[in-house]
Amino acid sequence: RLNQYFGLDWDAVPQHYDASLATDHGSGPSIAISCVDSARSRRDLHRNLFQRGSRATYWLDLGNTESGAQVVLGQPKPYPLPELQEWGRLPCVTELFPQLLEEQQEDDAPSCSVRISLQSQGLFVNDMAVRWASQLLYELFRGPIRQHGVLVNLSSKRSGPIDVNPAVWKRFGIRRRKPRGLQAE
């Protein structure tokens, strides 16, 4: 739908994202979209997307629990956005939620792609995450964004935005200084 609406010719490439793909300037992604089910996979993505030479400008990560989800659009490296000119870049999911990188987050629950996972995940939690992710991409393509993430709780029937706002990021524990080139002299 995004291709049709915006006249794009994107291809989805569902494959393991490793260091060679991250730096492949011929085919490396501009936007990496991840839906992983282990801390190890997310650590590998984090390492590959943050490495020098990575082509990915954005990282859209979707994660879920039994009745909740987080959808976060971040930037592994600085990229000029008018709304961020003083702060450099959008924090990624692994910066907002560093516990997602920790080994104890590993579990033996079935994969998101396995039918039996419905016993450990709500039936519609993945659908909700995908809908919010699609909305974030739609807004990004249309112009400046005011939110770069959403936290979803299906049990309470609530969703909350993650605003593009350094004060909000501080509540997540992010203390980022302005990039050197943007500091007042």
Language-model features and meaning:
Residues 1-7:
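Glycine-rich phosphate-binding loop and adjoining beta1-alpha1-beta2 segment
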Residues 11-13, 35:
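Short, flexible loop segments at the rims of nucleotide/cofactor-binding pockets, characterized by
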Residues 13-22:
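Conserved SAM/SAH-binding loop
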Residues 27-31, 35-185:
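Glycine-rich phosphate/adenylate-binding loop
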